[in-house]
């Protein structure tokens, strides 16, 4: 009976997306002034950030690169909703990799859903990058053909090249009252359907490099973030997934805790559309609310990034945290 209710909920979600999809136009709508980008030249100061779609990012500093949740295949909606087999799209992944560093130091994954982990085994094989994720994610990726990864839990710290990576607890937002695909599928060895890519333990990451601090989650910011003891407790950049109501309800508390110089809302796009179709806000996003919440944060600047258009996170002048100036983008 529970399975029937879950299936019914998924079908309602599909119907909602299909019926509402026409209401969401292409591009950034009334928010193009928030989109930042800079030249593709490697930064001499600061960290270069490239948005890969969904909750995917590349960070670059001092000739090194780090990936988070890279996902280029963009599996279509109906395949996900009706349990059809899904697999990485090699052509789309190769197109995405052309925008990235050849050999990233590591791939961080926030949780095991297909829109975060599906492409990772393919990318690991191409780039020889090391996977850093929860035990459940590492196991899921291995069953999908990846080399053994580095399982981590909240409180762990990894140092790779110039990167210090602190693992933090996170949550996953509910959809119609339930975390989607929240438990392993029974008797599944190799993940083949979207439901096989179960959430596992969600994680967030605090990335420190070149004297800068970046917080990233995929929408699972806890009501109370743990005390971050390193540095001054403030973030240079907070990348916060706010695709669903749960995370939007916690947004103000998260911003009060992080007090970032720059706020980058994430997981805002329609991740069932191919990347070459351009950015489109997802049908469950409420960016106007996100903008209002962020406007209450004194000294923080709200930004958006477009696909594969790098932006350099400026290093704060001097040793003291300063309000970010609005630069010409």
Q: Can you name each region flagged by the protein language model?
A:
Residues 2-11, 20:
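Short, low-complexity, charge-dense intrinsically disordered segments
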Residues 17-88, 193, 317:
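Zn-dependent metallo-beta-lactamase
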Residues 35-40, 64-109, 113, 118-122, ...:
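Pre-active-site segment of Zn-dependent metallo-hydrolases
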Residues 41-47, 61-66, 157-166, 208-214:
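Beta-strand-turn-beta hairpins that frame and shape the catalytic cleft
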Residues 68-69, 103-113, 132-134, 215-220, ...:
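Active-site neighborhood of phospho(di)ester-bond hydrolases with catalytic His/Asp-centered motifs
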Residues 77, 95-158, 163-178:
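Active-site HxH/HxHxD metal-binding segment of metal-dependent hydrolases
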Residues 142-145, 149-157, 256, 261-329:
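Binuclear metal-ion centers of metallo-dependent hydrolases, dominated by the metallo-beta-lactamase
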Residues 188-258:
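Active-site-proximal loop/helix segments of hydrolase catalytic cores
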């Amino acid at each position: 009976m529970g399975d029937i209710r879950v299936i019914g909920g998924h079908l309602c979600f599909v119907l909602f997306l299909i019926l509402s999809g026409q209401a969401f136009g292409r591009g950034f709508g009334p928010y193009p002034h928030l989109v930042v980008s800079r030249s593709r030249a490697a930064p001499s100061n600061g960290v270069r950030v490239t948005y890969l779609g969904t909750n995917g990012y590349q960070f670059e500093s001092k000739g090194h690169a780090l990936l988070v949740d890279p996902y280029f295949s963009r599996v279509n909606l109906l395949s996900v909703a009706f349990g059809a087999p899904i697999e990485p799209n090699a052509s789309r992944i190769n197109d995405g990799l052309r925008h990235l560093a050849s050999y990233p130091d590591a791939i961080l994954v926030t949780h095991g859903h297909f829109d975060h982990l599906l492409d990772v085994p393919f990318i690991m094989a191409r780039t020889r990058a090391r996977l850093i994720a929860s035990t459940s994610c590492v196991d899921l990726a291995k069953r999908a053909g990846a080399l053994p990864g580095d399982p981590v839990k909240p409180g762990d710290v990894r140092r790779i090249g110039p990167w210090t990576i602190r693992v933090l607890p996170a949550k996953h937002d509910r959809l119609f009252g339930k975390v989607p695909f929240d438990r392993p599928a029974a008797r599944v060895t190799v993940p083949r359907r979207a439901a096989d890519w179960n959430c596992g333990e969600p994680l967030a990451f605090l990335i420190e490099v070149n004297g800068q601090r970046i917080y990233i989650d995929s929408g699972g910011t806890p009501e109370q973030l743990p005390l971050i003891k390193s540095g001054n407790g403030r973030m240079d950049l907070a990348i916060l997934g706010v695709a669903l109501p749960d995370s939007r309800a916690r947004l103000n508390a998260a911003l009060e805790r992080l007090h970032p110089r720059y706020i980058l809302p994430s997981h805002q796009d329609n991740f069932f559309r191919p990347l070459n179709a351009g950015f489109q806000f997802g049908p469950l996003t409420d960016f106007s609310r996100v903008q209002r919440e962020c406007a209450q944060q004194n000294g923080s600047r709200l930004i958006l990034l477009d696909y594969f258009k790098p932006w350099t996170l400026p290093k704060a002048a001097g040793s003291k945290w300063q309000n970010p100036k609005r630069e010409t983008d």
